UniProtKB/Swiss-Prot annotation:
Record-annotated active site: H89, C132
Gene designation: CASP14
Entry's family note: Belongs to the peptidase C14A family.
Remaining remarks: Expressed in bacteria requires high concentrations of kosmotropic salts to be activated. The mature and the intermediate form differ in activity towards synthetic caspase substrates: the p17/p10 mature form but not the p20/p8 intermediate form is active on WEHD-MCA; p20/p8 is active on a number of other caspase substrates without any marked preference (VEID-AFC, DEVD-AFC, LEVD-AFC and LEHD-AFC).
Descriptive protein name: Caspase-14
The keyword Cytoplasm belongs to this UniProt entry's keyword annotation: yes
Species the sequence originates in: Homo sapiens (Human)
Tissue localization of expression: Expressed in keratinocytes of adult skin suprabasal layers (from spinous layers to the stratum granulosum and stratum corneum) (at protein level). Expressed in keratinocytes of hair shaft and sebaceous glands (at protein level). In psoriatic skin only expressed at very low levels. The p17/10 mature form is expressed in epidermis stratum corneum, the p20/p8 intermediate form in epidermis upper granular cells of the stratum granulosum.
Length: 242
């Protein structure tokens, strides 16, 4: 019987290029520039090559993701990881472009999946979404079926289309996202602070982001509000950024 392997060994190889794409609608979104500055600082510190586009239309959101995918697949050097940061007004499942038209998030996620981006197959793809997902506001609270048989193979020759992806939303489904008109968004500023000052795999870092946001109290129009991010992961290994 072979000795069990430590989970610490199961981590993504980050020796290749690290790439990031930032798409941000600044129109009628005061505080966006502070978020952009913070993200640029974070990506420099984490040794990412970052590309930024301000005020994309709905169509340009899709076009920029496709251009990013093509640039990744055409690189001669190996790519280890890709980040995509999307910041705009929105509602559940959609972002609003600078032109007021909507683009479906699901379509944006398609560009870098294991089927459409060969260079990122089995590589981590992280999406950071700073946008409202509804109209609700959280005031805070005081503190069987049929059996399914699963067969595991030691050396799989194929992987699912949507593995190795991490979607991080600034708020939970149905709720608005908060942004200060001078200091930027609570979510982006907290994420940058944790990612640049703390070490650990990315899900540990995001747990710390969630803790800080959940414990913070926001005030909007004189009323106390609470908020926390939502994390959806299909990562198969640990992802360390530093």
């Amino acid at each position: 019987m072979s000795n069990p392997r430590s989970l610490e060994e199961e981590k993504y190889d980050m020796s290749g290029a690290r790439l990031a794409l930032i798409l941000c609608v600044t129109k009628a979104r005061e505080g966006s520039e502070e978020d952009l500055d913070a993200l640029e600082h974070m990506f420099r510190q984490l040794r990412f090559e970052s590309t930024m586009k301000r005020d994309p239309t709905a169509e340009q959101f899709q076009e920029e993701l496709e251009k990013f995918q093509q640039a990744i697949d055409s690189r001669e050097d190996p790519v280890s990881c890709a980040f995509v940061v999307l910041m705009a007004h929105g509602r559940e499942g959609f972002l609003k472009g600078e032109d007021g038209e909507m683009v479906k998030l699901e379509n944006l996620f398609e560009a870098l999946n294991n089927k459409n981006c060969q260079a990122l197959r089995a590589k981590p793809k992280v999406y950071i979404i700073q946008a409202c997902r509804g109209e609700q506001r959280d005031p805070g609270e005081t503190v069987g079926g049929d059996e399914i048989v699963m067969v595991i193979k030691d050396s799989p020759q194929t992987i699912p289309t949507y593995t190795d992806a991490l979607h991080v939303y600034s708020t939970v489904e149905g709720y608005i996202a908060y942004r200060h008109d001078q200091k930027g968004s609570c979510f982006i500023q907290t994420l940058v602070d944790v990612f640049t000052k703390r070490k650990g795999h990315i899900l540990e870092l995001l747990t710390e982001v969630t803790r800080r946001m959940a414990e913070a109290e926001l005030v909007q129009e004189g009323k106390a509000r609470k908020t926390n991010p939502e994390i959806q992961s299909t990562l198969r290994k640990r992802l360390y950024l530093q």
